Amino acid sequence: MPHIRQLCWVSLMCLSSSAFAANVRLQVEGLSGELERNVRAQLSTIQSDEVTPDRRFRARVDDAIREGLKALGYYEPTIDFDLRPPPAKGRQVLLARVSPGEPVRIGGTGVILRGGARTDRDYLDLLKTRPAIGTVLNHGDYDNFKKSLTSVALRKGYFDSEFNKSQLGVALDRHQAFWDIDYNSGERYRFGHVTFEGSQIRDEYLQNLVPFKEGDEYESKDLGELNRRLSATGWFNSVVVAPEFDKARETKVLPLKGVVSPRTENTVETGVGYSTDVGPRVKATWKKPWMNSYGHSLTTSASISAPEQVLDFSYKIPLLKNPLEQYYLVQGGFKRTDLNDTEQDSTTLALSRYWDLSSGWQRAINLRWSLDHFTQGEVTNTTMLLYPGVMISRTRSRGGLMPTWGDSQRYSVDYSNTAWGSDVDFSVIQAQNVWIRTLYDRHRFVMRGNLGWIETGDFDKVPPDLRFFAGGDRSIRGYKYKSISPKDSNGDLKGASKLATGSLEYQYNVTGKWWGAVFVDSGEAVSDIRRSDFKTGAGVGVRWQSPVGPIKLDFAAPIGDKDEHGLQFYIGLGPEL
């Protein structure tokens, strides 16, 4: 019987505690700003069903409040509890009134630097970040300063660094706090020799990818850059370059070991797509990311759509002295076109020399050969061309497949002359620009501009691929693909020797990955600039930020054109830059 009474008493206590927890709400008064936020963070671990008015819970809240205030320099708060009766249809309130009290202030920030840190600019700059004498103590400042010392050590290669002493002393009677840090960075390590394991590429090519010299002072960003450069070659499936610390403790010269695994020798990619310009399209690509120990690579692709069928290849030859940024490219292929008033069979071969600069710009010189049999309107010709050219381009972007910021610029000059066997003299100058900017996350602006100029004495012999046509998705929307150019006496398109088009598009983030768009495109493709024939199209569209890039649907119509009135729609997938 006594055991039964004890069990009943325990059960009543549990029921009573549960009832209180369900009917009591905790409230804290007297704090604001950072003090309030820090205390709330300390109290956030308490669930609403845990709140009770008993002494044990009050002690728990008291400890949490003191910890939150102590971290910000308030060591002697006054905390009073009051259990208030419930308002109408409400719960009881356990009120904690807090007075932070007098804060502890910084009385001194003693930091002694030893080893290489004494003269290292990054460490000396770090000393300037210490709080001023008299500022309120913040434990976070002290902890972050110590973390920064360690961060510099890891970034710059002070791998033997240690704290001889690190103490935060508080004199409560004086309400002052003192930093006492004695830090020895030790000697800075230097890069040693880099060795590679598992590579199918000759070692001398890999060594020329290393962005530092043996004996250079260690920088973690240089190690990261080496990993990036090796991956960027496309030769390897995996890349890991890591320091060998056990071989460097005495000399402080840190050898690196790169473990790589070759990429699959052959890959085949197939795809089916659709764009309004060319309709359904099937494409297959065969890649050999490395063909031999010199790092040569081959890409071959075939693309078939109703107006265009293309078979081409690209053979890349990296240069030993700079395999990633300098290389030769041999390209060739066959293309058949039947679009609007153009019928063309084109065979091409090109040799290009590329330089990828550290500024992001890419330069190239090239020599192209082509044999074209074509009918443009009422003119049929066969033209053989041999012409050199130069090109400079740069693409920058931030924000993934649908950039929030970026630009793409490309400028080129090509020159043909009968003196070396070409069938026609010409000069071609082209410039293409795309700019993307985003304001306040939701407002996105896309601007495009294209300029082109052909100077020749025999335009009829210039192949259609080199002539200019406007209209279509990336030109002037509201008009069909390549439907804008001068016409012959039969009303057939001839192509133009001058091109100028521009586009301004505004996109608004409606929700999540969905964007609405409004745009206006304008420009002309003419052969006589004295007979200007500007065309303008405007419309609206939708953008979806898919995992493989933006998918868009646009509707556009010509503006102020007495001959064109129809509504055009455009579906596309692919990068905007």
UniProtKB/Swiss-Prot annotation:
Component of the translocation and assembly module (TAM), which facilitates the insertion and assembly of specific beta-barrel proteins into the outer membrane. Promotes the secretion across the outer membrane of autotransporters such as p1121. Disruption phenotype: 8-fold reduction in ability to colonize mice in competitive assays with wild-type. The mutant does not express the major autotransporter p1121 on the cell surface. The lineage of its organism: Bacteria, Pseudomonadati, Pseudomonadota, Gammaproteobacteria, Enterobacterales. Residues 187-263 form the POTRA domain. It is found in: Cell outer membrane. PROSITE patterns: POTRA. It comes from Citrobacter rodentium (strain ICC168). The chain crosses the membrane at residues 265-276, 279-288, 297-306, 309-317, 327-336, 347-356, 361-370, 387-395, 406-415, 428-437, 444-453, 500-508, 514-523, 536-545, 549-557, 568-577. The gene is tamA. PANTHER family: SORTING AND ASSEMBLY MACHINERY SAMM50 PROTEIN FAMILY MEMBER, TRANSLOCATION AND ASSEMBLY MODULE SUBUNIT TAMA. Pfam families: Omp85, POTRA, POTRA_TamA_1. It comes from the Bacteria. GO terms for biological process: protein secretion. Interacts with TamB to form the translocation and assembly module (TAM). This is Translocation and assembly module subunit TamA. Disulfide bonds: none annotated. Belongs to the TamA family. Gene3D superfamilies: membrane protein fhac, membrane protein fhac: a member of the omp85/tpsb transporter family. The keyword ATP-binding does not apply. Keywords: Cell outer membrane, Membrane, Signal, Transmembrane, Transmembrane beta strand, Virulence.
